[in-house]
Each structure stands twice: as C-alpha cells, then as structure tokens.
Amino acid sequence: MASVVVKTIWQSKEIHEAGDPPAGVESRAQLVPEAPGGVTSPAKGITKKKKAVSFHGVEPRMSHEPMHWCLNLKRSSACTNVSLLNLAAVEPDSSGTDSTTEDSGPLALPGPPASPTTPWAPEDPDITELLSGVNSGLVRAKDSITSLKEKTTRVNQHVQTLQSECSVLSENLERRRQEAEELEGYCSQLKGPRPDVLTQENCRKVTRSVEDAEIKTNVLKQNSALLEEKLRYLQQQLQDETPRRQEAELQELEQKLEAGLSRHGLSPATPIQGCSGPPGSPEEPPRQRGLSSSGWGMAVRTGEGPSLSEQELQKVSTGLEELRREVSSLAARWHQEEGAVQEALRLLGGLGGRLDGFLGQWERAQREQAQSARGLQELRGRADELCTMVERSAVSVASLRSELEALGPVKPILEELGRQLQNSRRGADHVLNLDRSAQGPCARCASQGQQLSTESLQQLLERALTPLVDEVKQKGLAPACPSCQRLHKKILELERQALAKHVRAEALSSTLRLAQDEAVRAKNLLLTDKMKPEEKVATLDYMHLKMCSLHDQLSHLPLEGSTGAMGGGSNGGAPPKRGSPGSEQ
C-alpha cells in the first residue's frame, strides 16, 4: 500500500479564511508537532482547542491551469483534536502530522512544486497597508471634493449676491442718471431767458434733488467700498483654494498607487511566476511531492487573497475614475464660475467708471451751486443797498413835497416882502448917504453901518411882515405902477415854476413808487433765490442806473427850486437902480 498524506483543516470559519492570512503575518511558518492526548500546543497566539476534520484524495487539474484547481475533498472517518498547522510550510515535519497507510493502488495524490512562494516578499509592505493608504487618500480626496463643492456653492452664492448688488447698483445709477437729467433740465430752465417762469417749487425741487443725490452718492460710495472688500476677500479665497491643488493631490495619489502596483507586480499571473513548475513534476522525490501537495492546496487557498485585492483595486480604479470625472466637472464649473466672476468684475469696473463720471458731474454741479450762492449773496447785499437808497430818496421826496406844499401861501408874503424890501432899501440908502456925508469915508464904520442896516432890515421885516400880508390879503388890488406890474409878472412866473415843480414832484413821486415796487419785487426774487447771476447783475445794473437818475433828479430839483425861488424873490424884491423908471416914479 502506498503512503497517503493526510492534512488537518479547521472545521470553523478559518476554513474559508485559510488563504487570507492577517496583515503583518507574512512569514514562513513551521510545523508544530501534535501533542499526545489530543492537546494542542499554542501556535500563532491561538490557545483554544478546536475540532478538526481530516480530508484526503486531493486531485489536481491539468498542468496548464495551475491557478484554478478544483478541490475534490473526501471526509475521512477519523476525527481528532489537533493543533493548528501551517499548511504553507516548506519543510514539513512528518512526526506529528503525517500518517501513512498502505494501499494496493498507485499513488493517488501527486505533489505540487517543492518550494511554493508567496506573492509578497517578507521585506515588501503589506497589500493592506497600501490599500489602507489608497483608501485614506480617497477619503481625503472625497473630503477635499466636498469642501471644494461647498466652496463653489459659497462662491456661487457670493456671485449671486454680487449680481444682485450689481443690478441694484445699475438701477440706482439709472435713477441717478434720470435725476441728473432732470437736474440738467432744471439748470437749463434756470439759465433760460424767462426768469419769471421760475417759481419757488422749482428751487425746492432742485434743492431736494441735490440733497437726495448727495445721500445716494454717499450710499453708492459705501456700497462700492463693501463690494471691493468682498471681491478682495473672494479673490484671496480663490487664490488660496484652487482645484489645481486637488488635481495635484489626486495625481500624486495615482502615481503612488501605480508605483506600488508596478513594484510588487500585482497581476493574475504573478503567483504563477513564483512557482517552479506544475504539480506532479518528475524532478521531485515522492516524499517531497506528497508533503507539498497539501501545501499547494494551501497556496490555492492563499491565491484567493490576490483576487480579493484585485477586486479592491478595481474598486479603487473605478473610484479614481469617478473622482477624475468629478474633478473635471468641478474644473469646468469652476471655469464657468470664474468667467461669471470676471464678468461681474468687468461690470463693477464699468460701474466704477460711470460712478466716477457721475461724481465729476456732481462736483461740477456743486461748484456751480456755490458760485450761484455767492452771486445770490452779493445780489442780496446790493438789493439791501438799493432798498436803503430808495428809502432815503423817498424821505427826500417827502420832504421836497412838504416844502413845495409850503410854497403855496408864501406867494403873497413874497410880494409884500419885495415891496417892503424896496422901501427898506430906499430908506437904508438914504440913511447911509446921510451917515457917509456926516462921518466921512471909514471902512470900519461902513461895515458897522452895514451890520446895523441888516439888523434893522431884519427888524423892520419882522415888524412890517404881518400887517403887510394882512393888507394884501384884504385889498388884493392890482398894481398900477410898472414896477408892480413887473413884480406881478415875476410872481406869475414863480407860480408857473412852482406848478411845474409840483408836477415834476408828482412825477418823481410816481417814479419813486414804481422804483419802490421794483425794489420790493427784486428783494423778493433775491429772497427766493431764483435768479441767475447774469440776470441778477443785469437787474442790479438797471436798478443802479435808475437810482442814479432819480438821485440826479432829486439833487437838481431842490437846488432849482431854491435858486428859482430865491432868484425870483431877489429879482422881484430887489430895488431898482437909481435913475431907473421905477425909482423916478
């Protein structure tokens, strides 16, 4: 009978995990002899007794299919408690685990190669470590993708807020433009040739629009400053967090994975290359083949590990492909959002340019308003001066009118005064002649005599004035002598002159009333601030010329009246020269 090798495989879940050794336990194990009495010695950290079952009759497949063996296991009747055996041992020990039986038939179980090798060398890192690194890289990549998605959503929200703010700013600018056009219309209306059309409502509208424009300009400045700060923050954030960094990390992870796979040669044909030949090669002794047959079965069990790792690698590759697709889609979305941000920046640049233009126009309007305010102040000052001049002229005209009215009852007094002056002159001349003949020619005495004569003349005038006036009023007789006729003519001329002066005074009073009305109207216009500087200057020039003409008339009128009155009185009251017809009469 031929000797048959019997191996013990655990009847537990380790029978399915025999080909998957735990991570870090990748070394060549030794066979442990079976203790007598079925008590197993501790090996590989396992101390519990387990029930085992024996199998025999392992049949290999053809030699050209070394990795896809089908196990044809038959359960034996022997059931014992044995220790855990390393089924992948290279140098087996037949003292504790092998049992031989005699059989008349040929050898039923040919052995695999003498030295089956594991797919990983002892000094190489474990596939689990590489897969854990790949999984951690994938987790980090997914986390970075989620963070990038969150950041892109935040960027989209910022872009939407910026677009809404830009739309609001454009609406505000459109409104400002309309208000600026209205303001220009008001300014053109203010500069128009019809100042009487301007009312107080227009000025109030202009002031309200100017104040609203100031407030809205300040709001626009604040909004533009906030937008600039937000854009700077977004640019810094986008510069700090870009998808290129994520792509670089993914490429580095792929390079590491490919380098690890290429270095360890993970492929379906790798375990085959590690074998020296198919099972049943005639170069090996029968004992060796018999012992290594069960070891080849263990190699088949351990061959399930690379298949599982291949599935994990396929999962990793599919995950990497999905990650690449997501990164490419994110990059495309990022480029679209970057274009939207560039468009928003361009719109903001145009908005800033339009805002600068509007601010320039606003500054020019402010300067023009300041100039108009200064012109209004000057116009108010000149109007106040004009009002004072008009008031003074009104006072002078009133005094002139009172004086002219007082000239009416003076006519008979002047007539009687002329007569009395003639009589007094005659008497004074006679007295002076007598004094000169008596005293002789002395200048001092002559001057004293003149003083005495003037004093006496005043006294005589005061004494004789009232009875003469009464007599003239009572009699009213026409003069008969030529001197009286001349005096009467002069008195009539004086009456005509007084009447003409009265008419002129009435005309002057009417013109003064008109000037007062115009001054009041100009003052009201100045108070309402509706006139342009050119109109104010023209009005002031016109009023100044008018006031100058009025002053000239007023200055000439009292002088003419006084000189006329005095001239008439002197001419009418002067005594005729000696030798004249009046003196002879």
Swiss-Prot record:
Residues 91-108 have a biased composition (Low complexity). Phosphorylated on serine residue(s) by STK22A/TSSK1 and STK22B/TSSK2. May play a role in testicular physiology, most probably in the process of spermatogenesis or spermatid development. PANTHER family: TESTIS-SPECIFIC SERINE KINASE SUBSTRATE. GO terms for molecular function: protein kinase binding. Transmembrane segments: none annotated. The modification Phosphoserine is found at S224, S281, S309. Signal peptide: none annotated. GO terms for cellular component: acrosomal vesicle; centriole. This is Testis-specific serine kinase substrate. Keywords: Cytoplasm, Cytoplasmic vesicle, Cytoskeleton, Phosphoprotein. Residues 91-125, 264-312, 559-585 are annotated as: Disordered. Testis specific.
